[in-house]
C-alpha cells in the first residue's frame, strides 16, 4: 500500500511538473506572438528607387493602403521569395532597419502616360491602372488626349467609354518604350486611331494593326523626318517602309 501511495505521489508530481512546463510554453509562445505583432509595427518606409517617379510619401501611403503593418513579416516574406505584390514596382527587396522601419530598394513600373483633368495629372501603367496622382508633371511621359474617361481613381484601372480606344492607347504607349524618340503627346480619336506627336511631327499611326512594323519604320526614318514640321501618314503599313509626309507649309489642294 505504501509503495502504491508513493507511486501515485510521484505520478502527481510529474503531472504537475509537465502541467507547469506546458503552461510556461504556452505563455512563452503567447508572449512571442504578442512581441511579433506589437513589437514589429511598421511605422516608416524609406525608399531607393531607380526612376524616381514615386515620392517617399507616395510609397508610404501605398504600403498603408495595402495593409502591410508588420515589419518582421514583410521582411521575412520578401527574403523567402513570397513578397507582397506592390503595384508600384516590377521587383523590390526589403531591408529591416529596426522593428519599426524598413528600406525598400525597387525597380519601378514605368509610367506610360498621363491624363490631365482640372490640373491634376493621372499617371497610368501598361494595364491602364492609375499609379500616381499629382499636381506636378513628370518629364518624358507623354500627355494623352482624346480618351473619354468615366472615372479616374488611384490604384484602379481607368474607366473609359470606349474600351477599344483604351486598348489601342495602351498598345501604343507600351510599344513606344522600345524606342528612344521622345513622344510629347498621344491622341486617340473615337475610332480608336492613334496619333503621336514627336518634335513638330504628327505621326498618324491609325489603328493598332501592324503597330510594331509602323514603329520600326518610323524609327528608321526618324532622323530625317524630325527635321520638318508636318503630318506623317502611317495609318496603313507600307511594305517597303515609305510613307507620305505632308509638311506644315504645304498648301492643301
Task: Name each model feature, range by range.
Residues 1-37, 190-207, 216-253:
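N-terminal positively charged amphipathic segments used for targeting/anchoring
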Residues 2-78:
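N-terminal membrane-targeting segments
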Residues 32, 39-53, 72-126:
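Periplasmic polypeptide-binding modules associated with outer-membrane biogenesis and secretion
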Residues 42, 87, 97-101, 116-121, ...:
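Extracytoplasmic
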Residues 50-87, 142-164, 227:
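Periplasmic/extracytosolic POTRA-like scaffold domains at the N-termini of outer-membrane
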Residues 50-52, 97-99, 107-111, 126-129, ...:
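Solvent-exposed coil/turn segments that connect beta secondary-structure elements
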Residues 70-74, 112-117, 154-161, 205-208, ...:
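Solvent-exposed, non-transmembrane alpha-helical starts
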Residues 105-181:
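Extracytoplasmic segments of membrane-associated envelope/inner-membrane machinery
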